[in-house]
Amino acid sequence: GTYGFDEYGIMLPWWTQVASVSNADKSNPTSDIPTRFYAGYDGGSLQRNVWLWMYPSDNLIQDDFNDGEYSWWRTDQNGEVYQNKIKKVNGRYYAFDGLGRMQTGFVLFDTRSTFVAQYDMDAWSSEDFIEGNIYGIEKADLYFFSPDELNDGSMQTGKELEIELEDGVYTFGFKSDGVAYGNRNRLKKVNDSYYINGLRLEADEEYGYGVVREDDDSYRVVNANGKTVTGKKKV
């Protein structure tokens, strides 16, 4: 097998030395060289093609090290940790930030090669999605990964995902490639329903209908399922 050693020839357990971590983007600190993991319990052998439930070394990210903050990490055939990418593993897709930590919940990526931000489901309200009041949402693609970090964490897709936000449970939609309908603050019509930043726009329950702005001069009326109201309707 492959083993890691420091400059004194002493076998390295756990993480290899990281030359430096770029903090130019505070929301996504990134290791500037590939990170590898050597098992401290297996004679120091390089861990290839495996999931690791670990906290990072202090030179990767000090806060997580100090807190003993565990995350999932995934290595490739060379033992290098996946970083800054959405990657298919055993038929499912997972998100990894610039250090290699798996991300769950709402995740923003600039294409699939630069992690931008992660948000828990209850971090924002429905109004925040409608108004686009979320850091990075205009310039990055929105995905949703199962919040069950311990047992799943994979990309979720479909037109009717029930997600509990700060102000209640709402319906979201994500394309087969994982990108949200109505991505990047652009209203999107899908099967006669409207979505913005993944959120399906629905009527006010009290009135049974709502108004959706398509552009500066155009509005549509939608019912409680987000469908366009056509013809005559008693209100």
Which role does the model predict for each range below?
Residues G1-V235:
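Extracellular adhesion/carbohydrate-binding repeat motifs centered on closely spaced tryptophans
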